[in-house]
Regions:
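Short alpha-helical transmembrane interface motifs in multi-pass membrane proteins
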Residues: 23, 55-56, 84-89
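Short amphipathic alpha-helical interaction patches enriched in hydrophobic/aromatic residues
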Residues: 41, 45, 131-136
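Generic hydrophobic, amphipathic alpha-helix propensity
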Residues: 4, 29-33, 37, 99
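Short secondary-structure transition hinges
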Residues: 63-101, 107, 133
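Helix-turn-helix
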Residues: 1-24, 28
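C-terminal peripheral helix-coil segments that are non-catalytic and often amphipathic
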Residues: 53, 57, 97, 101-105, ...
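Phosphate/oxyanion-binding loops and surfaces in catalytic or ligand/nucleic-acid-binding neighborhoods
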Residues: 36, 58-69, 109, 127-134, ...
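Hydrophobic alpha-helical connector segments
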Residues: 28, 39-68, 120-124
Length: 163
């Protein structure tokens, strides 16, 4: 809290007026971040870009102001602030309806193979959670998510549509 107050040039008391604890502050940051991710997804869906480009953007949907965060550094939250870590995991496992609806559109238009949507959701969410809980990848979280999107998309494309 001291570091945050110092960086913001305010007193710790001011922070504690809005957030009664470090955990409450972290929960607020998580909510802020994920609300921006959802807003970013809405903006992507409104863009006039090719289907596959839009799909990849949706899968990685990280707003520019959060791209520099290496989410793998959040692993200590699991032991220090389990409620915050659970909140992150819950967000990663939910909020997929717009993406799944968009994938269904691709299935309907024969751009994507007819595969169960729940399986895509399981693969993506479990991979994201695994990347958060693991330091096995030498790449940043954002790069790992980009890699995941590439692997997923190349596995779901109908090959005669690949350019």
């Amino acid at each position: 809290m001291e570091d945050i107050a110092k960086d913001m040039h305010i007193a710790k008391k001011t922070i504690y007026k809005f957030f009664p604890s470090k955990e409450a502050l972290l929960q607020g940051i998580v909510e802020y971040g994920f609300s921006h991710i959802q807003e970013n997804k809405k903006n992507i869906l409104q863009q006039d870009i090719p289907y596959l480009e839009k799909l990849k953007k949706l899968l990685i949907a990280m707003p520019a102001d959060l791209e520099s965060i290496d989410f793998k550094q959040l692993e200590p939250l699991q032991s220090q602030y389990p409620a915050v870590f659970h909140q992150i995991s819950t967000h990663l496992s939910s909020d997929w309806k717009p993406v799944l609806d968009f994938i269904q559109k691709g299935i309907d238009e024969k751009i994507i193979r007819d595969i169960p949507l729940y399986m895509i959701e399981v693969i993506v969410t479990s991979s994201m959670n695994s990347l958060l809980s693991s330091s096995c990848s030498p790449a940043s979280y954002q790069q790992s998510i980009n890699d995941l999107a590439d692997i997923l998309m190349k596995g779901i494309l109908i090959w005669n549509n690949v350019s």
